[in-house]
């Protein structure tokens, strides 16, 4: 039976206004919209009155917006029938944890009530199209239609293909019907294989074969034989990549054979809890570094949010499934798309060439895609710390004559680093009889055919198949699975995981054969043991769907009880679906129909399928010299600063958590003005050391339109000039991931790909001592469509994205582009050696040209000399700032350095030649260093020692003030105020934020950037930062116990435990399942801390589901109430823990006036480094800190203080319960965005109880208790930041 429960309004006023504006723009006469959430409960039994009241209260959440009786035509938007939304999965979990077992499933829709003039049926269809994502949602016309969400179908049987009766044609028909993308020789192979077996193939077997052997999974082009211009080539593409490892195997522990590559890391203290006692401690051991970079281009073109989200999620699983289990740590994200054409902000180089109906626009991709990628990383608990963003779409004269080149099929890049134990780097042995397990969520009828679909050019496959290949994301589920993997690897030798793979393209049909085959075994499986939420699925759909957040594992039978215990504690679902067999054979039984959908020798599935041969021709690009007749430097500056590739990326950065883990030493945001210009990302290797890891990206795809090999060399060079900003040492410590995107089969591209791979794999990397142990290829970068009577194609440039990874010697020595105004000198290191080529530059692009000659690596020895010189200078602390030269050239390099330093620049470019335009806008490799004036001679001498004497040019200096002046022999070439340039550079991000977020907030942030008097972040302390007030208590040897409390989805518990540990506590890991199961009670603890993250993925309100699972469970409720009423206890709630505790007011004495914390005013997740002031309050944790102003990490989507009315706010203030407030850089309490990131009244961001024993706050002191983890800090801070005082206060209070 289905019950319908009304919810709160679903859209804020500005969202409704945006919708109305969209309708008006489309000539749809809609006058008013009201939207509210509607909940649908699928019940297996009636609820009694108290259960009904409980369910009603459970579904009351979010901001208190006024509901009213709706008027107008109803359009009900729900998830597509036959799918289960992530919201549903998590809300149902909460209901069950609150004891409501009669609820089989909760689902949520949005009821839109539309008041409009008379609209035609077609116009109503247009209105409905604006309100839902057709890939994931459907529109009903009545609330009762939602019953279709809960229809349970009978299981469908397997179907076979009559190969023996109909011959080869049966396979050809199945190939088209199922979208298998099989080549002719593969059809021949299958015909021969099944004829030999003497039986017809089942659809599931063909589908499994197609996925396992798709270009996406098998990389046929990279393993192919090559004939170019009639000459057979000696090596495959993959062999040339492997040449880099053969030449430089140094420091590589695993390459080419696992889900990620592994290199040597540093010996540090890895911090985690003991399995038996729950006590956190440091474990001194090597933390080896794993690295992986994936792409998820096809799904992102179809449905950007889930496409980008599952792209990030799949890459995170690759990291976790490395060796015998590993720990993902920090991520990177990248996007290449066609022109944005922002409405009202269209640029002169942006022409609309049309697009296929089934893919979305570049603007849609960059509005939704980055949010999806960021949301997954945020909710999983992985900081995203670097990335790139390129737009390109133009009609150009390239290798193949005049044609359209651009990114209608986008690049969505997702990558990152993690850590792994030395003894877990290699997979174990799968013993015969080992249990074969699927860890993670249930099978759902989604993502079917992703591997085969992404192997086709967009437009080749059927729209319904595109539709079927889109996946959905549930990062909180993946977090639970990762917690299980963490518990396993933390057991060391007792790790129950023998072998692990992630489930990606092709679902279990790819993952399980890969698992047993890689382990030298076969597998015997039972289909109906696979967890499934949709009983009507066919065997093919159960086995081959791409439901996300799943892993496949082999666990020895005697270790199963331990594995079961770990999964139950973390609430991570799993199923034993088979056993490993001696014989390398795959069998899948179906208990329901008592038949065998799969019965195949593994070598038929994964054996010697036909090898591809590429017989291709070379085409040379002629290019036309740049026409400079209408180009002035002043106009060029403004255009280039508006090009999204160059322009400010704040809209892509602040949506992503950059502080979770407490181990982020360098994020994108630089300096007191938090300008997103960092060259590389840096993390600490642990919470107790200064060793670390670095990541950078290099990418120069448009150059491939003129010179394939130069483009590839530049990508490597740029990654190197970016990562050189930190202290790495030997260049052989740097390892690269190469991600290759090409339109294979397009004239000239295949030979160009071969040239590019050869340039990097056979020449440049071996010469530099660089290794490429990991990478990926995407070979179908083309879209086709019909535009009127014309057939059109948009082909991407050959695109190599290089990600560089390295171990860092000392993270404190990392340079940024932030200029200093002390007596200084700016030096250009020009690795282009005066070539100053303008082909395929940002300058050329903004004038709709390509040019002829591009930049290139001019001298490999000098590039190596540059890196070595930088390392010597970084280690000697001789440099004040560094920024590489890339998109936009020297002018942009200097401008971004000035923005970061909030200062002026005075440089003279006479030494760079007479062609000032080329000097300022060429994109040759190199960069600008800033040195103290007194060190200039010594630095230049050192650079000369490394063979760079002819590359170094003194430019001028950074000065206090606002002028940005470029001269040549004292004649002004360009002069402008830095603030004006800063505003131009920011306009793209402003416009994107206005479109996507609350426009009022976007306007306030843009306005703040125009304020030249802004002093930036600053610190005012009322206490001695170096005093350890906990030292006398630590000296007693007593270590009070703090319960580090987490719920499923919480992700900030480890750094919280470390902060309390440093202050003299024994930090104990306590999961809510421990309390609910009665395994642990709070009676033994002196302190309790509820940690940050996304409990239940913030479903049913941030922290509210967690709170209600306490309030609605009598025993646990009593446990918390007793703790809060006990004298001599302390409690802290941070972020999600703050939101949760604010909902426990009825249990906490003196908290009656506490507010609720609801959706940010910007309507967006905000990750900021914000200035706060400690106010006078009873809080015991903030004693002695009153009046201090200091920056702190902020990462939340629901942090805005909500009070009932003005009287409530006045009472909260008059009782003195406000503990922290946001202040602006002038030290004034503020409600202005982004200084106040959530719009809380009076800047309130922390409150306490009347006795001061319980304090809750939205910002994260635990993420910045180490100075090195602060995005910016004064030079004189030592190991501990001022926020360490909170934890030491806690230790002092407990005596």
Curated annotation (Swiss-Prot):
PANTHER family on file: PHOSPHORIBOSYLFORMYLGLYCINAMIDINE SYNTHASE (PTHR10099:SF1)
Keywords, in A-Z order: ATP-binding, Cytoplasm, Glutamine amidotransferase, Ligase, Magnesium, Metal-binding, Nucleotide-binding, Purine biosynthesis
UniProt subunit comment: Monomer.
GO terms for biological process, alphabetical: 'de novo' IMP biosynthetic process; purine nucleotide biosynthetic process
Major location category of this protein: cytoplasm
Biological role stated in the UniProt entry: Phosphoribosylformylglycinamidine synthase involved in the purines biosynthetic pathway. Catalyzes the ATP-dependent conversion of formylglycinamide ribonucleotide (FGAR) and glutamine to yield formylglycinamidine ribonucleotide (FGAM) and glutamate.
Binding, ATP: 307-318, 386-388, 678, 886
InterPro entries, A to Z: Class_I_gatase-like, FGAR-AT_N, FGAR-AT_PurM_N-like, PurL_large, PurL_linker, PurM-like_C_dom, PurM-like_C_sf, PurM-like_N_sf
Gene of this entry: purL
Consequence recorded when altering residue 1263 to A: This mutant is structurally identical to the wild-type protein
Residues that bind Mg(2+): 679, 718, 722, 884
Domain Glutamine amidotransferase type-1, residue spans: 1042-1295
Cellular component annotations (GO), alphabetically ordered: cytoplasm
Transmembrane feature ranges: none
CDD domains, sorted: GATase1_FGAR_AT (cd01740), PurL (cd02193), PurL_repeat1 (cd02203)
This enzyme's EC code(s): 6.3.5.3
Protein name according to UniProt: Phosphoribosylformylglycinamidine synthase
Compartments where found: Cytoplasm
Active site: 1135 (nucleophile), 1260, 1262
PROSITE patterns linked to this entry: GATASE_TYPE_1
Region (Disordered): 305-327
Pathway(s): Purine metabolism; IMP biosynthesis via de novo pathway; 5-amino-1-(5-phospho-D-ribosyl)imidazole from N(2)-formyl-N(1)-(5-phospho-D-ribosyl)glycinamide: step 1/2
Gene3D superfamilies per the UniProt record, alphabetical: 3.40.50.880, Phosphoribosylformylglycinamidine synthase, linker domain, PurM-like C-terminal domain, PurM-like, N-terminal domain
